[in-house]
From Swiss-Prot:
HAMAP family: Cytb6_f_subIV. Component of the cytochrome b6-f complex, which mediates electron transfer between photosystem II (PSII) and photosystem I (PSI), cyclic electron flow around PSI, and state transitions. It is a multi-pass membrane protein. It is found in: Plastid, Chloroplast thylakoid membrane. The gene is petD. Its main location: plastid. Keywords: Chloroplast, Electron transport, Membrane, Photosynthesis, Plastid, Thylakoid, Transmembrane, Transmembrane helix, Transport. One of its GO terms (biological process) is photosynthetic electron transport chain. This is Cytochrome b6-f complex subunit 4. GO terms for cellular component: chloroplast thylakoid membrane. InterPro entries: Cyt_b/b6_C, Cyt_b/b6_C_sf, Cyt_b6/f_cplx_suIV, Cytochrome_b_C_euk/bac.
């Protein structure tokens, strides 16, 4: 069983449409109007409806009320900034910290060129990119967990 719906080129109705320049002359269904006109609006409206419904059914607050006269003991950024916060906190030289943060996107830009020799799309057949992804994910999670700890345990996570 195939995932793609291939057209039956022996069908006379389809051949007549193709002769007039209508329809599509390759496998699958056309994006217009099937996806763009019918499927996408349903998905977008469904997502908006789910978000509004969940906000109405469970109106939770975003946290405790702020007190401008009381400073918290330790100020932490939002959770998605934990790895970069920990990286800047652990590296003593500010210039090296900023350069290490700039090296992340620069390194990610080089991965397609390193793996360009391999034309496979299966990630298990692209070992360099898969290895870089897995190591980067582990390092990011490690730095994110370390950002919530005191600075002397930020790299070792208190394990060593």
């Amino acid at each position: 069983m195939s995932i793609l719906k291939k057209p039956d080129l022996t069908d006379p109705k389809l051949r007549a449409k193709l002769a007039k320049g209508m329809g599509h002359n390759y496998y699958g269904e056309p994006a217009w109007p099937n996806d763009l006109l019918y499927v996408f609006p349903v998905v977008i409206l469904g997502t908006i409806a789910c978000s509004i419904g969940l906000a109405i059914l469970e109106p939770s607050s975003l946290g405790e009320k702020s007190n401008p006269f009381a400073t918290p003991l330790e100020i932490l950024p939002e959770w998605y900034f934990f790895p970069t916060f920990n990286l800047l906190r652990v590296i003593p030289n500010k210039l090296l910290g900023v350069l290490s943060m700039a090296a992340v996107p620069a390194g990610l830009l080089t991965v397609p060129f390193i793996e360009n020799v391999n034309k496979f799309q299966n990630p298990f057949r692209r070992p360099i990119a898969t290895t870089i992804f897995l190591i980067s994910t582990v390092i990011t999670i490690w730095l994110g967990i370390g950002a919530t700890m005191p600075i002397n345990n930020a790299i070792t996570l208190g394990l060593f």
